[in-house]
């Protein structure tokens, strides 16, 4: 089982039947991987913005951001291999996030569900938490990624997702709704999304 030291990550009872057990500072958390690996993260060094006000959670304190960083580094060490293409890296991060987080039906205001902490540490998030978590994972594995918020013209003005760069092109990625590498035409047609594109890279249309 994994051994991660340096930060405390609480157990999520609702995940017990879905994942194998791993020990974190004497507490059990759950993972979809059963491969035995030992990881010590006393001082996580994975790349990303873990300062206060980060896109990973603008109001998360340094302790919560440190927990996010610990999980992100564990993901990178366990799942990302030398020589992987950006496509494989993004697909791995996408599947990891969808396997280790479920939708927070109670609302965004519970358990930091609109942050990367909710998605990666607590295991529950709404769309904003999924998007912020995906941004953190992509930053760590060296894949260009943007965090995007819908505008008032969208079918759901509160919705949030990502844009990722794969193979020299930008695509829409929405881990919460299982949208993987979509073109803008597909995204607009299927989800009715609208967003301000100023400052964002131009995505593939198909």
What spans do the regions from the language model cover?
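Active-site nucleophilic cysteine motif
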Residues: 89-93, 123-138
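Linear, non-domain "peripheral" regions
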Residues: 1-74, 143
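Short, low-complexity, Pro/Ser/Thr/Gly-rich segments in the mature regions of secreted, periplasmic
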Residues: 195-205
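Hydrophobic/aromatic-rich core segments of domains that either
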Residues: 129-194
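Alpha-helix capping and helix-loop boundary segments enriched in small/acidic/polar residues
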Residues: 1, 63, 122-125, 149
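Secondary-structure boundary elements
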Residues: 64-119
